[in-house]
Amino acid sequence: METLANIHPGEILSEEFLKPMNISAYKLSKDIGIPQTRTSAILKGVRAITADTALRLSLYFGTSAKFWLGLQDDFDLEEVFKNKQVELSKIKKKEDYAA
């Protein structure tokens, strides 16, 4: 069974928001008051969406900040699981005990 690629929030920002609305990275940066380098890094998938950026995107697009942070959290968790699967598989569940 083929696994799906882990999608960075920057790809969702680009494909689901910027392209359909014909908004450039420069315009987004200017409109929400962040450096264009930050926007470009997010769109390239090399920078995470922070709480600050999530709030700005939510106000601009009429979404919630939790939407953007949730996308980032999902991406981060999948990356850690993928990169540390062997190490994480060694962790055993703590058995319940009476105190």
Label every PLM stretch briefly.
Residues 69-99:
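Short, charged recognition helix plus adjacent turn
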